[in-house]
């Protein structure tokens, strides 16, 4: 019985690590929301800047 409990604990720890990774993904989602707000501004300033410059900057940020 004790050995079985140890295995269940290791499994719960691995699940906790996966949840932590999901939390880090949530932080990335927040930055993605911010980039979306900026993208709206970029649409308004399309004439002033070239598309290539913006695409390169976006790739550098990610």
UniProtKB/Swiss-Prot annotation:
Superkingdom of the source species: Eukaryota
DNA-binding in keyword set: yes
Keyword terms: Chromosome, Developmental protein, Differentiation, DNA condensation, DNA-binding, Nucleosome core, Nucleus, Spermatogenesis
Organ and tissue specificity: Testis.
GO MF annotation terms: DNA binding
Chain residue ranges for the region called Disordered: 1-62
Principal cellular location given in the protein's record: nucleus
Cysteine pairings via disulfide bonds: none
UniProt-annotated location(s): Nucleus; Chromosome
GO annotations of cellular component type: nucleosome; nucleus
One BP term from GO: sperm DNA condensation
Stated family: Belongs to the protamine P1 family.
Known role: Protamines substitute for histones in the chromatin of sperm during the haploid phase of spermatogenesis. They compact sperm DNA into a highly condensed, stable and inactive complex.
Name of this chain's protein: Sperm protamine P1
Source lineage: Eukaryota, Metazoa, Chordata, Craniata, Vertebrata
């Amino acid at each position: 019985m004790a050995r079985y409990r140890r295995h269940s604990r290791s499994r719960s720890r691995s699940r906790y690590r996966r949840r932590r990774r999901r939390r880090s993904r949530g932080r990335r989602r927040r930055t993605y929301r911010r980039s979306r707000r900026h993208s709206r501004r970029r649409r308004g300033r399309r004439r002033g800047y070239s598309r290539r410059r913006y695409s390169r900057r976006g790739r550098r940020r990610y």
